[in-house]
């Protein structure tokens, strides 16, 4: 969940709503599901490239996703005795219905995406199936020695 909240226009209600969904909701969902996880399982958290790069109006959203990155690192230690791997995935610009929460539709959305594509080394936005394949990669038992990472699926955007 994310809405544009530039500094000076951040409301306490908007701030709380974003942290309630992206941070508090995540913590208590994972905690509630924890007894269901088998030893050697895998938890993959949904972070965002917004945690690693600045963008106007994305300060609060980016902060919530930085918290998600931190959870992956810390929870991988909390769950090491159960050999449960915890990783995060950070999608870049991926067209999803979530853009509606930003109030971006039609031409303004296309302009927003075009401005971001300029800084993506792969020269294009990503697709949802590319993120899904990255999640499957992390979830695989063949990746049993990967934990605590934040895998960027963003065409290299946050690396440059």
Where are these regions (language model features)?
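Alpha-helical segment proximal to the catalytic Tyr-Lys
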Residues: 35-36, 77-81, 144
């Amino acid at each position: 969940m994310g809405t544009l909240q530039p500094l000076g226009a951040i409301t306490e209600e908007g701030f709380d709503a974003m942290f309630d969904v992206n941070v508090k909701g995540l913590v208590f969902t994972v905690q509630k599901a924890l007894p269901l996880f088998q030893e050697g399982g895998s938890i993959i958290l949904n972070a965002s490239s917004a945690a690693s790069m600045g963008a106007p109006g994305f300060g609060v959203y980016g902060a919530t996703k930085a918290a998600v990155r931190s959870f992956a690192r810390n929870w991988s230690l909390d769950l090491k005795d159960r050999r449960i791997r915890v990783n995060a995935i950070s999608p870049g610009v991926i067209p999803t219905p979530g853009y509606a929460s930003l109030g971006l539709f039609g031409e303004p959305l296309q302009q927003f995406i075009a401005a971001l594509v300029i800084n993506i080394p792969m020269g294009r936005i990503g697709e949802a199936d590319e993120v899904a394949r990255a999640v499957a990669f992390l979830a695989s038992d063949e990746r049993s020695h990967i934990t605590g990472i934040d895998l960027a699926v963003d065409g290299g955007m946050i690396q440059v």
